[in-house]
UniProtKB/Swiss-Prot annotation:
The gene is pufQ. Required for bacteriochlorophyll biosynthesis. Directly involved in the assembly of both the B875 and B800-850 pigment-protein complexes. GO terms for biological process: bacteriochlorophyll biosynthetic process; photosynthesis. Keywords: Bacteriochlorophyll biosynthesis, Chlorophyll biosynthesis, Photosynthesis. InterPro entries: PufQ_cyt-su. This is Protein PufQ. It comes from the Bacteria. Belongs to the PufQ family. Pfam families: PufQ. The lineage of its organism: Bacteria, Pseudomonadati, Pseudomonadota, Alphaproteobacteria, Rhodobacterales.
Amino acid sequence: MSDHAVNTPVHAARAHGHRAPRAEFYVYFAVILLGAFPVAFVSWIVSTIRHRRLPKRGPFASAWFDAKAITPLIFRA
């Protein structure tokens, strides 16, 4: 008889664990952050002019959020 509980998704997730980010991750993060900042800055200015009030997040926070969301997607692919 075989044990079907050995390779369940819960056990597989625990076996891989959380990997610490490496230097390559930080390089990609920095490049994406530098690319996202000008776009976020222009978007922030347009939003400020259009709505006549400051957005909740500033341009750097917005670029940081975008880089934080995009970089892990590169390594999952």
